């Protein structure tokens, strides 16, 4: 039978985002260089107004078979390079490739709660396939920028707060700016020791949904 179309290559893009952006979620634009479908020939690789013909060597299957002993060896047709078609008049813009290098600006929807290594897939935004075949996908890998106040452990946010000896001995209250824009008040018990952890429920990172 006829060989199925060869997809374009998948692409990877590494993106650094702030902890604030990971907390709130936000659409961000990226610009990438990618092999995109040629607009002149609409990806066919043939000069507009001309036709492609079925490869006469493989009969349009894109594959060649040869008997080697007890085995049948299948390989890509050397005449049409697996496409099953031969272009007699190549497109002058893309030189018969069906794709050209372009710079594209894409919008990436970043959901709240993403973390280091979170992968976002943009279907069909990878390289265009050869001769008008389907494109690959674009995978965005997220990396968290270092934050001036918080360290992150999963959905937990950690910060270190210096307090006076008097506050440690007598107790008091501490205000910490949250990523939600609010100032969170934390009660410090009297006699607290250095290194003691205090927890503020609900003030950490949101849970990433649907992943």
Segments from the language model and where they lie:
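Charged, often glycine-enriched C-terminal and inter-domain segments
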Residues: 3-27, 70, 85-93, 97-211
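Cys/His-rich short segments
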Residues: 31-106
């Amino acid at each position: 039978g006829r060989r199925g179309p060869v997809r374009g290559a998948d692409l990877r893009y590494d993106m650094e985002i702030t902890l604030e952006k990971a907390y709130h979620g936000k659409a961000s634009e990226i610009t990438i260089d990618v092999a995109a479908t040629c607009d002149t020939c609409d990806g066919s690789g043939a000069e507009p107004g001309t036709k492609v013909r079925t490869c006469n060597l493989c009969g349009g299957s894109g594959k060649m078979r040869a008997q080697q002993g007890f085995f049948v060896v299948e390989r890509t047709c050397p005449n049409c390079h697996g496409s099953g078609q031969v272009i007699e008049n190549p497109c002058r813009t893309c030189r018969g490739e069906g794709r050209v290098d372009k710079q594209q600006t894409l919008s990436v929807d970043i959901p709240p709660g993403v973390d280091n290594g979170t992968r976002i897939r943009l279907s069909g935004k990878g390289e265009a396939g050869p001769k008008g075949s389907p494109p690959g996908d674009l995978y965005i890998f997220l990396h968290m920028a270092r934050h001036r106040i918080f360290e992150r452990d999963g959905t937990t946010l950690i910060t270190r707060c210096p307090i006076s000896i008097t506050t440690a001995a007598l107790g008091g209250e501490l205000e910490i700016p949250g990523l939600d824009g609010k100032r969170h008040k934390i009660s410090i018990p009297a006699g607290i020791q250095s290194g003691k952890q205090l927890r503020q429920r609900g003030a950490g990172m949101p849970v990433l949904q649907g992943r």
